[in-house]
Amino acid sequence: MTSFSLPAFSRLSPRIARAEREHHQLQAYFRLHRQDVERGDWGALSAVSLGVHNVYNGLEDILISLARDVDGAIPLGPTMHQDILDQMAAEISGIRPALLDEPLYEALTELKGFRHLVRHKYGFDLHPERVVENVLRLDGAFPQVIKAVVWLHGLLSTPAP
């Protein structure tokens, strides 16, 4: 489990562990059922799409925790899901540098859009190629988010010269 010494990061260890477990389960299922997904099997498409949805929720939960406990402000309202990504991609002067670089921000924005589709379309618009594309996108983005969080913790843990 990833552990942190700063109080502002204290909620993250169990959140990261939960998201990692979900991501590993998704990867294992996808390895076994990728051909079913590519063929358009409804059960496999639904299971894998929901897995991407759930892992993205875990990543968003981590970002919301950082917004609350490091930045001191959580976006609210109908655009909060995009706003949290915007906030994490921006430097907060005197508090922290940008957490998300442009490619990671774009990947998370795409995953957020896919999550919205899964959540609100009930599987009717799940196309096999989009599902595979988003599993692969998540496989790239997930470790980058965790690495960025660990990097930020290290940066904020280091006393200023």
Residue ranges and their predicted role:
Residues 1-161:
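Solvent-exposed interaction patches of small proteins and small membrane subunits
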